[in-house]
């Protein structure tokens, strides 16, 4: 059996390939043009973000199993996999703790103006007239309202941590829904009443560019936006404009629509109220270890004829 990982460099820990008897190939990265040659003859493909679409899958008759080394699997054409009887598994829950803690860290950074004051300290404090600097307004976390979009494992974990800090937590119903489920508020109410909004929903045709000029204009003027889910949830041109114009108070993003971003991405501009990190909210040591373990568990289960964590 041939097993190929297409983007091994995305994992800071190596897969313990000796646990499963197979012909392993761990490729650092694989361009779109090289996917078919790389997977020719392979029974199992492992991918973190390398896309596997219908036009690629039809050229790989021996491929039987795809393990996505992540929780989100929007890089896989599930319909094409079903048509070709290719099983697909993901690794759910591996980063729940890491991502939820990253969100709380972002809330502190934004509300307490840590980025701005770190800069002020070096430039202005030595010339200050007294013991402290008063520049940007600092806001408390306790008592603030956190709106969460997506009530999966990570969304609920963020909610629990936020409540422990004294925050008021509300979960948004799906945009455009005519029915509000128990435990939710309407999407529009969440926008209008939240001090911080954190995105934790999958990327789909229904959620693509969920946050755009219109939704940004419905948020509180001081509200702050956090996205650790998928970059495509946000219209990046609209967000950059909103931050420049002060439509909202700030944002913290760990994901962008294209990764790595192109140099002309508007969110790479000088935006003092934006905290941008390179898709590492998931990557605590324990998060990475959980992911590696989950990948190996999925492959072992497939080899034994009892696949787990199937998404198709």
Question: Where are the predicted features?
Answer:
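Glycine-rich Rossmann-fold phosphate-binding loop(s) that bind the pyrophosphate
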Residues: 151-152
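Phosphate-binding beta-alpha-beta segment of Rossmann-like dinucleotide-binding domains, i.e.
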Residues: 92-145
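Rossmann-like adenosine-cofactor binding region
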Residues: 51-57, 174-266
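Short beta->alpha connector loops at strand-helix junctions that form conserved
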Residues: 28, 69-70, 86-97, 173, ...
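Rossmann-like dinucleotide-binding domain for NAD(H)/NADP(H)
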Residues: 102, 222-312
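N-terminal Rossmann-fold NAD(P) dinucleotide-binding loop
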Residues: 155-156
